[in-house]
């Protein structure tokens, strides 16, 4: 499973990018996106995905469907 950033809620602040341990987050077309192939939801490293902890916008980053 991977996390996904809601492009409607992303403010492009970039706070999520540097905290990702797998470097799965990158800017694209004015917002940030998460590469589902490399996102691990921080399993085995942290209790919660670090991007969710860093994001100041509620419900912007959620598990991908």
From Swiss-Prot:
<keyword id="KW-0004">4Fe-4S</keyword>
<keyword id="KW-0408">Iron</keyword>
<dbReference type="GO" id="GO:0046872">
    <property type="term" value="F:metal ion binding"/>
</dbReference>
<feature type="domain" description="4Fe-4S ferredoxin-type">
    <location>
        <begin position="2"/>
        <end position="30"/>
    </location>
</feature>
<keyword id="KW-0249">Electron transport</keyword>
<dbReference type="InterPro" id="IPR017900">
    <property type="entry name" value="4Fe4S_Fe_S_CS"/>
</dbReference>
<keyword id="KW-0479">Metal-binding</keyword>
<keyword id="KW-0813">Transport</keyword>
<feature type="binding site">
    <location>
        <position position="10"/>
    </location>
    <ligand>
        <name>[4Fe-4S] cluster 1</name>
    </ligand>
</feature>
<protein>
    <recommendedName>
        <fullName>Ferredoxin-1</fullName>
    </recommendedName>
</protein>
<feature type="binding site">
    <location>
        <position position="20"/>
    </location>
    <ligand>
        <name>[4Fe-4S] cluster 2</name>
    </ligand>
</feature>
<feature type="binding site">
    <location>
        <position position="13"/>
    </location>
    <ligand>
        <name>[4Fe-4S] cluster 1</name>
    </ligand>
</feature>
<dbReference type="GO" id="GO:0051539">
    <property type="term" value="F:4 iron, 4 sulfur cluster binding"/>
</dbReference>
<keyword id="KW-0411">Iron-sulfur</keyword>
<dbReference type="InterPro" id="IPR017896">
    <property type="entry name" value="4Fe4S_Fe-S-bd"/>
</dbReference>
<keyword id="KW-0677">Repeat</keyword>
<feature type="binding site">
    <location>
        <position position="55"/>
    </location>
    <ligand>
        <name>[4Fe-4S] cluster 1</name>
    </ligand>
</feature>
<feature type="binding site">
    <location>
        <position position="39"/>
    </location>
    <ligand>
        <name>[4Fe-4S] cluster 2</name>
    </ligand>
</feature>
<dbReference type="GO" id="GO:0009399">
    <property type="term" value="P:nitrogen fixation"/>
</dbReference>
<feature type="binding site">
    <location>
        <position position="51"/>
    </location>
    <ligand>
        <name>[4Fe-4S] cluster 2</name>
    </ligand>
</feature>
<feature type="binding site">
    <location>
        <position position="42"/>
    </location>
    <ligand>
        <name>[4Fe-4S] cluster 2</name>
    </ligand>
</feature>
<feature type="binding site">
    <location>
        <position position="16"/>
    </location>
    <ligand>
        <name>[4Fe-4S] cluster 1</name>
    </ligand>
</feature>
<comment type="function">
    <text>Ferredoxins are iron-sulfur proteins that transfer electrons in a wide variety of metabolic reactions. This ferredoxin probably participates in nitrogen fixation.</text>
</comment>
<keyword id="KW-0535">Nitrogen fixation</keyword>
<dbReference type="Pfam" id="PF00037">
    <property type="entry name" value="Fer4"/>
</dbReference>
């Amino acid at each position: 499973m991977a996390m996904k950033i809601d492009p409607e809620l992303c403010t492009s602040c970039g706070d999520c990018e540097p905290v990702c341990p797998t470097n799965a987050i990158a800017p694209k077309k004015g917002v940030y996106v998460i590469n589902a192939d490399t996102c691990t939801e921080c399993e085995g490293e942290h209790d919660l995905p670090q991007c969710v902890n860093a994001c100041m916008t509620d419900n912007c980053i959620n598990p991908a469907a």
